[in-house]
Amino acid sequence: MAPLRILISNDDGVFADGIRTLAAAAAARGHQVTVVCPDQERSATGHGLTLQTPIRAERADELFAPGVTAWACSGTPADCMKLALFELVKEKPNLVLSGINHGPNLGTDVFCSGTVAAAMEGTLEGIRSLAVSSACFQWRQFQAAADLALEVSEQAIADQWPDNLLLNLNIPPCAREEMGALRWTRLSIRRYDEQFSRREDPRGRAYYWLAGEAVQDLESAGEGPRDWPSDVAQIHANSPSLTPIQPDLFWRGPLSGLPQLKLKDQLVR
């Protein structure tokens, strides 16, 4: 394969081991690598954009492997992608990689994920994009995830990766030889026990810390081959999960499945 122009971002920030391992692995395979990522932790920011304050970007090449061009940006992951594509990167990338996230991005958690949002921004701009996550917050060995992300991306590009298709890759916390087979998976629906820790500042004013724990994972109600496992089940089986995601969130069921609405004696149809 000819060298690719790869743009890499994340939501864990410029000092995260995951993104540095991914960038080094891509450069070692001969690709032209540019990193534009947040200058600090921006996890769970979703697809948020910075509109009320200026966005700053500083070069950060010294934090990465030789040959990698890097920028640290004061904005969100989506800001980083927009700034990269429309200002910092002079030639359009062939591939966007986001990650390696320090923790899973499974099921409906993708709606909160800054990692997935960065990849989705690439998808919306017509670039093949893959988000990759290590499915354990404590696991800090990222080489297997980096290698698998690049293998999947290179093969998907060689096999005519469809437009408007984001690939979401989650890797179990183990060595490559201990993993099961990579499989296509469906998104789970995750239910959380949301908890807030209420505290008071020195002036007696209340503030809150959000803490939640996934207590239930439901099978996806969406379309897709029913023999595919859910992404959560695949990770629980100590196997990597690859979920195809589209930006189109449109309802695909029948009209009869929607609420019947009648406004001013006129049926909504």
UniProtKB/Swiss-Prot annotation:
> Keyword annotations for this protein?
Cytoplasm, Hydrolase, Metal-binding, Nucleotide-binding
| Annotated Gene Ontology cellular component terms | cytoplasm
Q: What highest taxon heads this organism's lineage?
A: Bacteria
Extract one GO molecular function annotation from the record.
nucleotide binding
Q: What is its EC number?
A: 3.1.3.5
**Functional summary from the UniProt entry:** Nucleotidase that shows phosphatase activity on nucleoside 5'-monophosphates.
The record's annotation in PANTHER family points to: 5'-NUCLEOTIDASE SURE, 5'_3'-NUCLEOTIDASE SURE
Instruction: Give the UniProt family note.
Output: Belongs to the SurE nucleotidase family.
What name does the UniProt record give this protein?
Answer: 5'-nucleotidase SurE
Query: What is the name of the gene encoding this protein?
Result: surE
